[in-house]
């Protein structure tokens, strides 16, 4: 589908935009700090933005009560434990998860949730790990646990310019996996793990939630990375039932940081075997007897003392998001994304060449509010993303550049092959820039912008104005030297 060559002059002119007007009202009241000093925030995939009401609620709660370590039974401990328990129930309620089927484990972040699953999963020769190229490094890292257990690790490639996984490839890999063999051999206890993101943090592609059931029918547990999906999309666990869901709360509503969650089906959680124990995770332990008994609920996975002063803020954030409406946020983000893609597609140099190269879908279908792209000079060469980061910062735009901790999606977007990467590594390179030069890549990353709960039309318009006024018809070789790349 080709973008409309004459897009609307402003997102506000789009059909349906007026129906999302409450977002504009909230921006002017609860999120007015976003407009301080002419800043434009375009990194919701990196972190959400806290409403002023959230900060006030945290302040008021701490001043009105006294709370202490919930691992005790004194009044202040009971008060803290009560708030933590209320937050657990709020999480299940928000995601429409049956408390008899699901439980909530609080973690430091989504990465911590992934690690809990990886370190405790029963991998082995007949329990493989299946991943997509399009995964955050916190999910990719699970492969190290699988390999240490001598399990096979299979990756599903991305196809075409939209950077999607072909479902036929997924079915073929799942059917060929040892999980299916184990079932045929009459060993239903040993399963495989399939881990993928509901939404790509690189391209914004939304991978089908129907893959959860597809994999489970083939004997796999499913870990769904919802960190990029949940802030602007409804995840209903009464309809889609992954075995594990990883989340970071600051990505949903900006605050608190340092708190994430693993939502786990109780049946899947019972199959995990933790390699160690810590304070708060055990019912009893003996030093001389060399034995321990883990707790029999979610606390067996919550190491040490929980962040009991911040976890109650999760409940406030969920109530806040629910009062606004996830569907309303989804609609606003979809409109801004569609408009931006149309506008970027119309930007062309006087040479006729495109100014913007988008990685991923060029329409709003099957994607979220994350748009990743590179800019091109009139001669077709790429503008270094480090230059864009520097000049965007000067213009007051907060965006992201690099590979966004998603190397597989970047490799797919830039057309990098496994053979070429291995050859370059064997040749010996010491720096990121040397590696990129050896691969023949014109740049080491891309530019990512993302919309979220408080995004408004002027955010998208300011971005387009910046791109057009700064890079349209700008020749290569006019930039000042850039610092070396220290990481992707």
Regions found by a protein language model. Give the residues of each.
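Pyridoxal 5′-phosphate
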Residues: 1-488
